């Protein structure tokens, strides 16, 4: 983010002052009258500054152990000073947020190679949370072993099944190395370093090697260099909203259901097409308790409170069986 230091400092002071005054709504009204804070990059910086200025009690839960990709995403979304708490499963992360044990949860929602994380979609629907941010991280895997272990001696490589699947070409080139699935990439590194076996390694990121003192035997072993994971920042639904950015810098995620009749999905999407609203992603998941009926998750560009998105959502609510806005949040710009 390339902004002048004085502009960023002005932005920080303005947003921190608003936080101290607990004046979120007033903040939204005042932003357009501050010309120096009108650019999207400054607005996004303001959102980050608000996070930085929150009391030190804020916590974030993520799935995995120290050195996991989700921990890196949490640092991106919050700050290096954030109090981060690892959880064993995605279910644990959502439960921690919903029950007030953590102010935020950081969860992966999709990967450019593996596709959508379906369980995360289900948990978004099942828990009373909302999305308030997103980030995208490039995923680069390495083969990591205890010190003094040679690549030629490795016979087992531990990692999350998705990570192993993204490194198939490496395992074809090294047929003596068996891929062993475990629950977490960084956790695999922690395990092999603790055990100290001369024939075991793990597939994870460079940062995991740094955290646990591992040695990198092979770098960039993923099949494709363009490997990215998108992460969401979730918080309890009743939490105050963060600072607003311009509508075009927002993404909105909704979930809706329709009747099983011809043209129902088409009619549901028509209000967005007629208003030229960009639909970034659509995902379907089974509606539990209703065999062969589905929930549709939709990512669209724009803010739910701003026209024309608000008009389209109103029209959708008339046609659909149910509609729920899961969150409007500053979208990742890369």
What role is predicted for each listed range?
Residues 1-7, 11-15, 24-334:
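Domain-level signature for soluble enzymes in the chorismate/prephenate branch of the shikimate pathway
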